[in-house]
């Protein structure tokens, strides 16, 4: 593990950019960027277009390591190059800590939750991530209803994978998303917090994780988790809120920082001039940085 990157992730001021839309969500991400499905005829062309979009983001002067601590990549992005370097190396050289999304998507809903699908090639993927100088990983589950067994299952599965990831020298981001429209969102979050605390308490001193959570209904609910000795940082997802709304809610939560995807890229368009693009990205970065660093 890179100690300098660990120090940056633990104490740095800023947020994490989530650039990890994968196969399923790529057409939607491209459409929002202004690239329609009739502009590519197969997956290779689609992934090239999305890589071009991400390259435009990470090479922009607005994508500044003074405000962006890390970036989460999709597996394809890790294996591609930006300006002649593997994406992870490009980011690290720029001062941005690279993470890799390792999950294979969500299973069908059961007990009010969606567990992760099996990750059969996890070992190989992690070995490649280490080779590509990736610092950590991210994997997402989804909680839709107040069901204690379901929530317990989500957390257990996350920690089971997390331990394998830690064993390879990487820092896992555990992401049990709570759907922002869930009927009992506040109660779900209380149960989730208790289960996460159990999982964290069972780790050895040297087993470090990060958490990526939905912004809680009750402000500062996750402060205890952020202060846990095994937690490097707690980051939050935008989860379907607009950027302004997500930023407003984030400001009420001390110690939590953003890890936004759609809320970061929502004003970016393929048709923008470089100047317009840099300004739109810069405005988004500034507002998300402000919500991550300057609290109410």
Curated annotation (Swiss-Prot):
GO terms for biological process: glycolytic process. It catalyses: beta-D-fructose 1,6-bisphosphate = D-glyceraldehyde 3-phosphate + dihydroxyacetone phosphate. The active site is at 175 (proton acceptor), 212 (schiff-base intermediate with dihydroxyacetone-p). It is an enzyme of class 4 (lyase). InterPro entries: Aldolase_TIM, FBA_I, FBA_I_Gram+-type. Its EC number is 4.1.2.13. Pathway: Carbohydrate degradation; glycolysis; D-glyceraldehyde 3-phosphate and glycerone phosphate from D-glucose: step 4/4. Belongs to the class I fructose-bisphosphate aldolase family. PANTHER family: FRUCTOSE-BISPHOSPHATE ALDOLASE. This is Fructose-bisphosphate aldolase class 1. The gene is fda.
């Amino acid at each position: 593990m890179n100690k300098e990157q660990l120090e940056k992730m633990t104490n740095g001021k800023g947020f994490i950019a989530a650039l990890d839309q994968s196969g399923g969500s790529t057409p939607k991400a491209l459409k929002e960027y202004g690239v329609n499905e009739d502009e590519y005829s197969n997956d290779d062309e689609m992934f090239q277009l999305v890589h071009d979009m991400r390259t435009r983001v990470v090479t922009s002067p607005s994508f500044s390591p003074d405000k962006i601590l890390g970036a989460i990549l999709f597996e394809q992005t890790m294996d591609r190059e930006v300006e002649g370097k593997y994406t992870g190396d490009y980011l690290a050289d720029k001062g941005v800590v690279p993470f890799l999304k390792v999950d294979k998507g969500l299973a069908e809903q059961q007990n009010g939750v969606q567990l992760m699908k099996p990750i059969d090639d996890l070992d190989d993927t992690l070995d490649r991530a280490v080779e590509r100088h990736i610092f950590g990983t991210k994997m997402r589950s989804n909680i839709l209803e107040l069901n204690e067994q379901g929530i317990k299952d989500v957390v257990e599965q996350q920690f089971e994978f997390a331990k394998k990831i830690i064993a390879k020298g990487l820092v896992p981001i555990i992401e049990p998303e709570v759907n922002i429209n869930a009927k009992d969102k506040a109660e779900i979050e209380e149960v989730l917090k208790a289960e996460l605390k159990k999982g964290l308490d069972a780790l050895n001193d040297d087993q470090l994780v990060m958490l990526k959570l939905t912004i809680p209904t009750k402000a500062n609910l996750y402060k205890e988790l952020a202060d846990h000795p095994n937690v490097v940082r707690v980051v939050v997802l935008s989860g379907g809120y607009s950027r302004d709304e997500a930023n407003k809610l984030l400001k009420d939560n001390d110690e939590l920082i953003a890890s936004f995807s759609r809320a970061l890229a929502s004003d970016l368009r393929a048709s923008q001039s470089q100047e317009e693009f840099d300004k739109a990205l810069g405005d988004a970065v500034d507002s998300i940085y402000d919500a991550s660093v300057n609290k109410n």
